[in-house]
Amino acid sequence: MDQVILIGHSRAGRDIFEVAERLPDLGVDGLLAVAPALISPFSGELPDVPTSILIPQYDGDVSTLDGAKIYDDLENDPERTASTELIYLKGGNHAGFSTALVRPDPFADAESIAATMPAEKQRAFFSQYTKEFLQSVLEKQQTPFADTQELPDQYADCEILMQVDVPAKDLFSAVGADAQLTTEKAAADWVNASSTVDNTAGAFRLPGGFTTYDLLRIRWDEPDAEISFPCSADLSGYTNLQIDLAQDSSDERNGQQDQQVVVMLQDARGNRAAVTLPAGTPALRWQQGEIERIPMWEGEDFLQYSTFTPLGTVRIPLEDFQDVDLSAIREIRLVFPSDAGSIMLREIQAF
């Protein structure tokens, strides 16, 4: 048997990874995990095959959206060569992918159920993406958006937010919290966006239920604040700059407004070129919600934003950075034109 792709929903969304790893003779070509439930740790290595993970915003069953944790495990495998996609489906819920589950999520609250998209619309999204996933994996051995320059914020008439991982050159990473940087009119600090008491990221809320997730939090209170990352990189053989980031919608500095970011490269001769990520870029949008206070102990509350704020991947064609020597890049700079704001930065790569 050849051309094998496994698709699993909920607990089966986790189990397909185990099947592919434990039965190598099956020759699995790709994995599509739908609202996967990470009920126990994986028993071995995760398969190095094209993988897509769908997580619905209003999942009352897998309320921590465990698929984000699986994506992170795949992304941080240094030996991995296959592409990976994480798609956050706004307005989706756990049951909406399947006709076998006709009732709303039994653990979802009334407000979430009211905001959930019609099940027919969610299944149409799932059907279209599944077809495209199968075609892309079998014909190109990659996930559908692996080499797409401008990642969409709409798919099958549904709003989405996407992270995509492909083999790439790391230029900055928040993992380990030890990268060099300088700031001007901005404050930067390393935070742990954890779902536990070890959280240091305030009310910022990632999907995934992480115990540890390193981010660089950048905050500013006046326009044209900057943060710079020194590097020594030859980018002439790459086509795109890729940034994983998110607006911290829980921070009142953002004023419930979308943000914009100017991305600047500087070469060894001091030449600079800039590209603007405009307000409305999916990863820089304000996500509607409010800060919730969860009572803990000794009078302290755990702060949590009512809406998940996933990271999004932004890609910029390197050819858009004109008049710099891409073979001798020495600095990456982010400039924030707005009067005030706050973002979370995970990584900057070239591929």
Predicted regions and their residues:
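Active-site-adjacent alpha-helix of alpha/beta-hydrolase-fold enzymes
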Residues: 46-120
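Extracellular ligand-binding interfaces
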Residues: 217-323, 336-351
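Gly/Ser-rich "nucleophile elbow"/oxyanion-hole loop immediately N-terminal to the catalytic nucleophile
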Residues: 1-9
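Noncatalytic modules at the cell exterior or secretory-pathway interfaces
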Residues: 323-333
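Gly/Ala-rich beta-loop-alpha elbow adjacent to hydrolase catalytic centers
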Residues: 8-12, 16
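Alpha/beta-hydrolase-fold serine-hydrolase catalytic core, especially in secreted/extracellular enzymes
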Residues: 91-94, 100-226, 236-242, 247, ...
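A conserved short beta-strand
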Residues: 25-38, 50
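Alpha/beta-hydrolase-fold catalytic nucleophile elbow
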Residues: 7, 32-35, 54, 89-90
